[in-house]
Amino acid sequence: MKIGIPKEIKNNENRVGLSPSGVHALVEQGHTVLVEKDAGLGSFFEDKDYKDAGADIVSEQSSVWDVEMVIKVKEPLEEEYKYFKEGLILFTYLHLANEEKLTQALVDNKVVGIAYETVQLPDRSLPLLTPMSEVAGRMSAQVGSQFLQKFNGGMGILLGGVPGVPKGKVSIIGGGQAGTNAAKIALGLGANVTILDVNPKRLAELDDLFDGRVNTIMSNPLNIENAVKESDLVIGAVLIPGAKAPSLVTEDMIKQMKDGSVIVDIAIDQGGIFETTDKITTHDDPTYVKHGVVHYAVANMPGAVPRTSTIALNNATLPYAQLLASKGYREAFKANHALSLGLNTYKGHVTHKGVAEAFGLEYTSVEDALKED
């Protein structure tokens, strides 16, 4: 199979779809890999590293898209839509429930859109989302602490406190991979940490995991309101695979927070859980202030630590990329049901229910869509 690795063009997106080791693995299987010139520089991979791994380096962006499968990190931007074509396999994070234009472009051009974030194992875990959830979760506590500093617009709080001064209060809404990793870092910084989740079993697991060092609370509107208004830092880490994130924190709740407190919305790429995160920010300009509260709403948080993120992502995605390249998508879906759940668009159909519901589009099951070929 002929595979393309474009250079990411999203603001400060320094990750790359495959590392040189991933390219080497595919070339060893007999596939041809085209890598756009300088695609790996943001992750400190040189063109020579890719060439030594067996890739062909191409200067024209159009050439790297003129392939059978494109492997990326983030969803294509509008200037890349012109490269879409019928039957192209697009393997990347798509987050379509918050991307109506992209969804329509994929449908109109009959692209086979496979989203990392909806590949799901029988135990309901998300193997291609997990590594980036771990990174974003850990980063959320770090950046939250950073923006609590006075010169960054915060109230000037040290999360760990000092003797005689209370610790900062951190509330994390969502106890999945991102929320758990946020709690690990927040605890490491010495904060007073509360996790809210709708699943009592998960709260019990978190209580055991952290040896009772975090407060675990059932997530409901009243508990969220009480936690939010008392917190110095609130981290939103709720995920519904493939669907738009639920709006859990209202504007009235935000108004009750102290001036200079901070919210970090990890779920912003799926629409966000805070009513006041009404715009996506970038690493160049990551925050804005609303009702006195610093809002951090960067959709590609792991792009700030690209070396770690690229290697972690490559470790997870490579086996699926190898399967797609070696068998083609039809046989790959038959061989791996988890991968078939990643199919969001297929030759004019929307094949993920959450995406279809987000925009009032007709939903076609993966099985039915494949039958129409």
From Swiss-Prot:
Pathway: Amino-acid degradation; L-alanine degradation via dehydrogenase pathway; NH(3) and pyruvate from L-alanine: step 1/1. Substrate binds at residues 15, 74. It catalyses: L-alanine + NAD(+) + H2O = pyruvate + NH4(+) + NADH + H(+). The keyword Chaperone does not apply. InterPro entries: Ala_DH, Ala_DH/PNT_CS2, AlaDH/PNT_CS1, AlaDH/PNT_N, AlaDH/PNT_NAD(H)-bd, NAD(P)-bd_dom_sf. It holds the Pfam family AlaDh_PNT_N. SUPFAM superfamilies: Formate/glycerate dehydrogenase catalytic domain-like (SSF52283), NAD(P)-binding Rossmann-fold domains (SSF51735). The active site is at 95 (proton donor/acceptor), 269 (proton donor/acceptor). GO terms for cellular component: cytosol; plasma membrane. One of its GO terms (molecular function) is alanine dehydrogenase activity. Keywords: NAD, Nucleotide-binding, Oxidoreductase. Its EC number is 1.4.1.1. It is an enzyme of class 1 (oxidoreductase). NAD(+) binds at residues 133, 177-178, 197, 219, 238-239, 266-269, 298-301. GO terms for biological process: alanine catabolic process; L-alanine catabolic process. PANTHER family: ALANINE DEHYDROGENASE. NCBIfam families: alaDH. Homohexamer. Trimer of dimer. Catalyzes the reversible reductive amination of pyruvate to L-alanine. May play a role in cell wall synthesis as L-alanine is an important constituent of the peptidoglycan layer. Belongs to the AlaDH/PNT family. This is Alanine dehydrogenase. It comes from Staphylococcus haemolyticus (strain JCSC1435). The gene is ald.
